[in-house]
């Protein structure tokens, strides 16, 4: 299995649009073109009442990257959650997830982790998103950028990074596992349908199953039993790797759900597992000292 076979099988291909790659200097508005039309009847829209929410710039050694931040308007410092994007980048759904977390009392931060490689928001073909942008993003760069995001959050004075959690979806689900093995400051992680196995490469030398023994925080994995790109056998393999390493991990597999069952803006959305997973996320962060 090549590195992105799981993602490509899990996501429906769309029509092709040629374009010139543009380096992202700000976040996209709305939803990624690759998921149009949006399933408006199920899309959840969380308001920003009582919140400070919007785009920020995170300093890096080689410049800045855009990010979306949401937090309560009053009080703090707040427990901190990194929100890691799907394959489609930091679009409206990821921003809405940040606002949902902020309504629960968190400082939520979603950095645009593709910023150096290109802007996926104008692409309408998933294979193109993978080949032109996502496949060129090194895991080491992502880990470093997330470290910088934590430092940025701490520097605001509004984020309690001693209570640090991470959650991610699809591409970000895989990153959630990797970051929980990378940063000892992480208290807990929740990975939504993130790929667990795959071929290694120079840019992506390890997958979650390879770093199970290095996990530094408890991780909850939320998966769909009908996900065509993430076979249940690979989930079982990750379970065994965590068990053999003596790591605290839990897995919930929703039998009838496919990939992206939490993505309420897409036809893949399944309300019951999405709502159950969201409750489990809250309980997991509370249990392991993030809340």
Swiss-Prot record:
Enzyme Commission code(s) on record: 3.1.1.45
Catalyses which reaction(s): 2-(5-oxo-2,5-dihydrofuran-2-ylidene)acetate + H2O = 4-oxohex-2-enedioate + H(+)
A Gene Ontology molecular function term of the record: carboxymethylenebutenolidase activity
Protein name, entry field: Putative carboxymethylenebutenolidase
Domain of life the protein comes from: Bacteria
Keywords: Hydrolase, Signal
Record's keyword annotation contains Hydrolase: yes
Signal peptide segment: 1-40
Family: Belongs to the dienelactone hydrolase family.
